[in-house]
Amino acid sequence: MKSVRYLIGLFTFIACYYLLPISTRLLWQPDETRYAEISREMLASGDWIVPHLLGLRYFEKPIAGYWINSIGQWLFGANNFGVRAGVIFATLLTAALVTWFTLRLWRNKRLALLATVIYLSLFIVYAIGTYAVLDPFIAFWLVAGMCSFWLAMQAQTWKGKSAGFLLLGITCGMGVMTKGFLALAVPVLSVLPWVATQKRWKDLFIYGWLAVISCVLTVLPWGLAIAQREPDFWHYFFWVEHIQRFALDDAQHRAPFWYYLPVIIAGSLPWLGLLPGALYAGWKNRKHSATVYLLSWTIMPLLFFSVAKGKLPTYILSCFAPLAMLMAHYALLAAKNNPLALRINGWINIAFGVTGIIATFVVSPWGPMNTPVWQTFESYKVFCAWSIFSLWAFFGWYTLTNVEKTWPFAALCPLGLALLVGFSIPDRVMEGKHPQFFVEMTQESLQPSRYILTDSVGVAAGLAWSLQRDDIIMYRQTGELKYGLNYPDAKGRFVSGDEFANWLNQHRQEGIITLVLSVDRDEDINSLAIPPADVIDRQERLVLIQYRPK
């Protein structure tokens, strides 16, 4: 009976966090709009080999993540939930692997359930796991690969070991097809310390080639297909997207070595109080094979990405699966022996909630700021933000009422965030970061446009997805579409600022021409170097400028 209650509680938890509130949040640009539009175009064109964005070749990532996203939109429609369905599914599958692996290590159902709940409620997991990017997919394949390797190394027969390594190769292959060759480097680095300390080199060398073969066979069909269709794909993807992105001096998203320290601290909420103890307990019990495996799995990818020049918070998502298991194991021991860390965790959550309440007041219309984040007419959004932090503080307090028993309720600290964040985004943010909001405000003007031009790839993708058209033209800036625009068949998909007046004269009689520009808040749109327009509609950071046939 208790198991049934636990399952009902888990499914209710998942529904409140990962299902019910998702449609209330508009898509963010540039990431969510980009991946939404790539998958929409894949479904519309039926081309499941070559990824396209705005009808242009888009070689920044391989294909597998787009497949899953496309299936999500195919099943649930071209809506906010459909766009995010793939990442939510991947996150829940990863949580299922956390459950299975914890059971495999400790044979404790309560511990497995707690590890799962901790994982799903970690701030970084929830933030990325409900956000339409490719990182939850690669995190799933990496976690699946680590589970497969453990399964192989614990097997007692050659059949079991062979099956485990074959499965490892498949997960690595799918990882390569999702985000590239990092799916090979990260698992290898993660297992090496464990293999070395356990002296398991023999099994690795005897059976490792099976993983290599299954990985190659997994990638080969699509790899050959895209090489035949687009011979330049692999050169661009390997050199630009791997070497330049991570290693060279001009790497994308450059950041210092310590970049991930605040990411781990913030990402560990609402379980931050368990982080030091979980890592220390893991190190203290390093003679235990499973603990060494989890520690290595957590730390090695973190060190790898810290050394790399290019960094983003999403890169270390897979590290939080083993960390959640270590936290759950440590929390049960602490509840039984010394609940100090659990009390500290409760106070951290109270402090975070109270700080959020104060910060919300400071940036509200009634605070001391001359330019508040919310305007007076957005009062309900301020109250939503207050509710988010009030619930966080409340559940932090509740965990302290009987800490040995109530500490798991820290998982409910982000409940207000999950349910209300979509209702608390300020209009000034929505107008620049949510193209859907702009489209809703200007739908009647946009719909009949013969040509639409914009200077932002993220906005272009949002317009294309919302309007169900992939012929948006880039104006002045090419951004990440620069490579695709270099192909001969992309001629006419970019108009420079100097060419715009002539281009306008040539095409004006064909129908309404709409220009959507991103501007600074204090920028005078009358000073823009463009021909006089028939219509100008400014929505804070985005401006609709329209030219009608003469």
Curated annotation (Swiss-Prot):
* Biological processes, Gene Ontology terms: lipid A biosynthetic process; lipopolysaccharide biosynthetic process; protein O-linked glycosylation; response to iron(III) ion
Q: Name one GO cellular component term.
A: plasma membrane
UniProt function note: Catalyzes the transfer of the L-Ara4N moiety of the glycolipid undecaprenyl phosphate-alpha-L-Ara4N to lipid A. The modified arabinose is attached to lipid A and is required for resistance to polymyxin and cationic antimicrobial peptides.
Q: Which gene encodes it?
A: arnT
The name this protein carries in UniProt is: Undecaprenyl phosphate-alpha-4-amino-4-deoxy-L-arabinose arabinosyl transferase
Where does it localize?
Cell inner membrane
Q: A Gene Ontology molecular-function term?
A: mannosyltransferase activity
The protein's topology relative to the membrane is: Multi-pass membrane protein
Signal peptide location: none
- Known EC number: 2.4.2.43
Indicate where this protein is primarily found.
membrane
Top-level taxon of origin: Bacteria
Q: Which residues cross the membrane?
A: 7-27, 81-101, 111-133, 137-154, 165-185, 204-224, 263-283, 288-308, 315-335, 346-366, 382-402, 406-426
- Reactions that this protein is recorded to catalyse: 4-amino-4-deoxy-alpha-L-arabinopyranosyl di-trans,octa-cis-undecaprenyl phosphate + lipid IVA = lipid IIA + di-trans,octa-cis-undecaprenyl phosphate
Pathway assigned in UniProt: Lipopolysaccharide metabolism; 4-amino-4-deoxy-beta-L-arabinose-lipid A biosynthesis
Query: Which Pfam families does the UniProt record give?
Result: PMT (PF02366)
Family to which this protein belongs:
Belongs to the glycosyltransferase 83 family.
